[in-house]
Amino acid sequence: TPGVIALKICPDFLAQAPKAPLTICVTGTNGKTTCSNLITDVLEKDGRRVVSNRTGSNIVPGCTTNVINSLTFTGKVRVDATVFEVDERASRLILPYVKPDYLVVTGLFRDSLKRNAHPDYIFSVIDTYCPDSAKVILNADELCSSMLKKDSYRVFYGIGKQPDDKTEPYNLIADYQICPNCGEKLKYNYLRYHHIGDAACPKC
């Protein structure tokens, strides 16, 4: 791919390449492709020139190809916005260099244990390597990712209580049953699945 070739010629291509006026990154365990494609569609319908890695090539070579597609042959930016779908594990190799204006996080869940370990590990990767200057758009219903980048500008989104929601964890895997601040058992006003829902700590 163009990204592989560019990285062989210039390993720090992502850091050196010119940036579009608007850069949006989307990461998370699930829903990255859908979310980034929706954002791209909205921007295009608004009349903006946009490039994105629509097919889900979301590690370093794919994101590098995305940058190449945003440039003319002479290296000038030819788009109004670049949208990156970013693999959550590879975010440490991408976010510091593309320097997003906005980072959208869909949520963090258990994935392949061999690859991603625990959601807390992926949390630490994103929290450490996302530039503080990025405006962060977070899933308020997902307890792990909603705590990202506490010192950055943050906006939250979520879905209100639904008729089939529960009040107690019912999955075999429930990663967040205790408060990350004090260790008290969390009380769920409603719970959709895993740890998606509206939780509060009765102690702090």
What are these regions (language model features)?
Residues 1-181:
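Phosphate-binding loop of NTP-binding sites
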Residues 179-182, 201-204:
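Short cysteine-rich clusters marking metal-coordination/redox-active sites
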Residues 197-198:
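Intrinsically disordered, low-complexity regulatory/activation regions of eukaryotic proteins
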